[in-house]
Curated annotation (Swiss-Prot):
SUPFAM superfamilies: P-loop containing nucleoside triphosphate hydrolases, TrpR-like. Its main location: cytoplasm. This is Chromosomal replication initiator protein DnaA. One of its GO terms (cellular component) is plasma membrane. The lineage of its organism: Bacteria, Pseudomonadati, Spirochaetota, Spirochaetia, Leptospirales. Transmembrane segments: none annotated. Pfam families: Bac_DnaA (PF00308), Bac_DnaA_C (PF08299), DnaA_N (PF11638). InterPro entries: AAA+_ATPase, Chromosome_initiator_DnaA, Chromosome_initiator_DnaA-like, DnaA_C, DnaA_dom, DnaA_N_dom, DnaA_N_sf, P-loop_NTPase. It comes from Leptospira borgpetersenii serovar Hardjo-bovis (strain JB197).
Length: 437
C-alpha cells in the first residue's frame, strides 16, 4: 500500500508547486487504499477543506495514473484532542458559517449620483474580477458600503459556486490574528485560510491603526499575496485612504485601484430606498408617508430602514392593514432628526467668521486652498454642523465640497478647539451671538 501511495504522491508532485506540495500534500496520511476507496487523513479541517477544493481531482487522477483504476477519494480529519483555541479557529475557518445578507443585493441598491461610481465599480468586480483591484469604497455610516460588499459576495458565489469569498470586518480579522499568534500551527492555519480565498471583502478598515504593527504586517502580506495572484480585493472605510492612520506602504496599495466616494443620498434616492424596502416588507405605505420619511431622515439610511422595521412591527402587533401619516409620525418619532425652529442665515455665520480673520466671506466660500483660508473654512463647517445642526451633506452643498472634506474639517476643528484657547473663545462668541436659547 505504501508503494502505491508513494507512486501517487510522485504523480501529484508533478502537478503542484513544491511550496504547496509541502504545505498541503505532505501533511496527508494514507488510511486505506483498495479497489473501492482511497481514504486520506488530513491533520485539520482547514487542510481538509483546502485539499478538497484545490487538489482532490489531482489526487484522483494521480491514482488513475499509478494504479490504473478510477478510485474515489475520501478525506477525513485526524481524530485527536484539540484545544478550545484550535476548535475556535477551525470553526471560524468554515465559510459555511457566514451567509451574505439576502436583502443586500444589486437589485435592492438604489442608484443615484451620490453612489453611481461605487455601484458601477462593484458590478465590474463581479463581471471581471481583479480588473479593478482593489476597489476602495468610502463614505459615512449608512450610505451603503456594507450593502455593496454583500452584493459583490453574493453575486460572485451565484456566478461560480466554487468561488471562495470572505467578508470580514477588520476588527474580527485582528481578533483572529491575535488568537493565531499563540502558536506556529495556528498562525499557519490562519495564513492558509485567508490565502485560499478568491475574493476578500474587508469592512471598516479605518479601525486598523498604527498601534497594531503585527496585524498591519500580516494584512500587508495577505494583500500582496492576493493581489499578485489577481484575486479580487474590496475594502470599505468611513474615510479616504489618505486619512487612514496606517503605514504609508499599506495606504499606497489602496490607491492602485479605484477609490469610490459614496455620498449621503438626496431626497429622491431616500424616497427610492423607502419605496423599495416598503414593497419588499409589504407595508402598503401611502405616498404622503413615503414623502414624510424621505424628507425627515436625511443622513444615515439605516435610520430609514429602522423606521420601516418599527412600522412593520407595529402593523403586525395590532393586525393593521393601513397606517395614516399621523400614526406613522407617532411610531417613528424617536428616530427622526429633530429640526430645530431656529432661523438663521448661513451667510451671517460665514460673514462673522470672515470678519474675525479679516477675510471676505466669498474667499472662505471659494475653492482656494490657501493656508490662511483652511482654518476659517473649517470653523464655518463646525459652527454650521455642531452648533446650528445643519447636516454634513447640506454643509457640503453650501461650500460645494465633498462630504468627506466636511468630515475632515470637523475633525480638525475639534482638535484645534482642544488645543487653542483663542479659537475656542472665537467659536463661543459667534455661537452665543446667533444661537437662540
Amino acid at each position: 500500500m505504501n508503494l502505491a501511495w508513494n507512486k501517487i504522491l510522485e504523480e501529484v508532485s508533478k502537478k503542484i508547486s513544491p511550496q504547496y506540495y509541502e504545505r498541503f500534500i505532505d501533511t496527508l496520511k494514507l488510511e486505506t487504499l483498495n479497489s473501492e476507496k482511497c481514504t486520506i487523513i488530513a491533520p485539520s479541517a482547514t487542510i481538509k477543506t483546502h485539499v478538497e477544493r484545490k487538489y482532490q481531482s489531482i489526487i484522483e487522477n494521480a491514482i488513475l495514473e499509478a494504479c490504473g483504476d478510477k478510485i474515489p477519494v475520501e478525506i477525513l480529519i485526524e481524530t485527536k484532542a484539540t484545544s478550545p483555541l484550535q476548535s475556535f479557529l477551525e470553526k471560524s475557518f468554515d465559510q459555511k458559517d457566514f451567509q451574505f445578507n439576502p436583502d443586500y443585493t444589486f437589485e435592492t441598491f438604489i442608484v443615484g449620483d451620490c453612489n453611481r461610481l461605487a455601484y458601477t465599480a462593484a458590478k465590474e468586480c463581479v463581471r471581471k474580477p481583479a480588473e479593478i483591484n482593489p476597489l476602495y469604497l468610502f463614505g459615512s455610516v449608512g450610505v451603503g458600503k456594507t450593502h455593496l460588499l454583500h452584493a459583490i459576495g453574493s453575486e460572485l458565489i451565484k456566478k461560480d459556486p466554487w468561488k471562495t469569498v470572505c467578508y470580514i470586518d477588520i476588527s474580527s480579522f485582528m481578533n483572529e490574528f491575535r488568537f493565531a499568534l499563540q502558536s506556529r500551527e495556528l498562525i499557519e492555519s490562519f495564513k492558509i485560510k485567508y490565502q485560499s480565498y478568491n475574493c476578500l471583502l474587508v469592512d471598516d478598515i479605518q479601525l486598523l491603526s498604527t498601534n497594531a504593527e503585527k496585524t498591519q504586517d500580516e494584512f500587508f502580506a495577505l494583500f500582496n499575496f492576493l493581489f499578485e495572484r489577481k484575486r479580487q480585493i474590496v475594502i470599505a472605510s468611513d474615510r479616504p485612504s489618505s486619512e487612514l492612520t496606517i503605514h504609508e506602504r499599506l495606504k499606497s496599495r489602496f490607491v492602485t485601484g479605484v477609490q469610490a466616494d459614496i455620498q449621503y443620498p438626496n431626497k429622491e434616492i431616500r424616497k427610492g430606498i423607502v419605496t423599495s424596502h416598503s414593497k419588499i416588507m409589504d407595508l402598503g405605505l401611502s405616498e404622503d408617508v413615503l414623502e414624510f420619511l424621505a424628507d425627515q431622515i436625511e443622513e444615515d439610511t439605516r435610520l430609514l430602514l429602522g423606521a420601516l422595521n418599527d412600522i412593520y412591527l407595529y402593523k403586525k402587533s395590532y393586525s393593521l392593514l393601513f397606517l395614516n401619516l399621523d400614526k406613522v409620525k407617532e411610531i417613528v418619532k424617536n428616530r427622526l432628526y429633530r429640526k430645530k425652529n431656529v432661523e438663521f442665515s448661513h451667510d451671517r455665520i460665514i460673514e462673522s467668521v470672515a470678519k474675525e480673520f479679516n477675510l471676505d466671506a466669498a474667499e472662505i466660500m471659494g475653492k482656494s486652498r490657501k493656508k490662511e483660508l483652511i482654518i476659517p473654512r473649517h470653523i464655518c463647517f463646525y459652527l454650521l454642523h455642531n452648533v446650528f445642526n445643519v447636516n454634513k451633506s447640506q454643509v457640503g452643498r453650501l461650500f460645494q465640497t465633498q462630504h468627506t472634506t466636511v468630515i475632515h474639517g470637523l475633525r480638525k476643528t475639534e482638535e484645534l478647539l482642544s488645543d487653542n484657547k483663542e479659537i475656542r473663545f472665537l467659536v463661543e462668541r459667534i455661537s452665543s451671538k446667533y444661537k437662540l436659547q
